[in-house]
């Protein structure tokens, strides 16, 4: 993360350990989501997509349902993206307009759009996690896993945030701060 680098906890990260994620959140009626993704009320669907969605750039696409929206986007290796001359927003739009993806999102309203730099170096990216007044968690701490078949990050971010919160709570209750 920029924060941990600026705090002196780690040096610059090689581009082959980084990816950029571009995501849109598309609002849809829950009944439409259930019908299009063939899920029942209270269920969800998640898809990891490879192939044309990245035009040969390392990475992939994703779709996952929420109660009244669908999150859809791409994650692209930064070094491959830079060499390609494509932009992350162009590839994001290419994925969302793909003939298989666009019918799933048709008629929806764009609620959110965002980009995020993602660490993909796994254990090789982990570094010191604490400094005075600073506690690094989630992907900023290098808690990610991408083997191509398994992609994890949100669960590790949530778990590390919970562990950090418990540690801070304990330190505050024991007056062990300073």
Task: Walk through the language-model features, giving the residues of each.
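Predominantly flavin-linked oxidoreductase catalytic cores and closely associated redox partners
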Residues: 1-106, 143
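Active-site proximal loops enriched in glycine and acidic residues that flank catalytic Cys/His/Asp
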Residues: 74, 138, 158, 172
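Flexible, glycine/charged-enriched surface loops at secondary-structure junctions
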Residues: 103-114, 175-178
């Amino acid at each position: 993360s920029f924060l941990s680098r600026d705090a002196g906890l780690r040096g610059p990260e090689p581009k082959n350990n980084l990816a950029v994620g571009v995501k849109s959140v598309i609002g849809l009626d829950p009944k439409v989501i259930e019908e299009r993704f063939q899920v029942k009320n209270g269920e969800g669907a998640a898809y990891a997509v490879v192939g044309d969605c990245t035009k040969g750039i390392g990475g992939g696409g994703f779709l996952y349902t929420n109660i009244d929206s669908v999150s859809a986007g791409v994650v692209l290796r930064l070094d491959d993206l830079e060499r390609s001359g494509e932009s992350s927003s162009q590839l994001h739009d290419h994925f969302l307009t793909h003939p298989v993806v666009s019918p799933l999102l048709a008629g929806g309203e764009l609620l959110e759009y965002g980009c995020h730099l993602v660490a993909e170096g796994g254990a090789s990216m982990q570094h010191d996690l604490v400094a005075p007044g600073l506690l690094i968690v989630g992907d900023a701490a290098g808690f990610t896993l991408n083997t191509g078949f398994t992609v994890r990050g949100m669960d590790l971010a949530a778990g590390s945030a919970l562990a950090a919160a418990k540690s801070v709570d304990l330190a505050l209750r024991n007056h062990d701060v300073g």
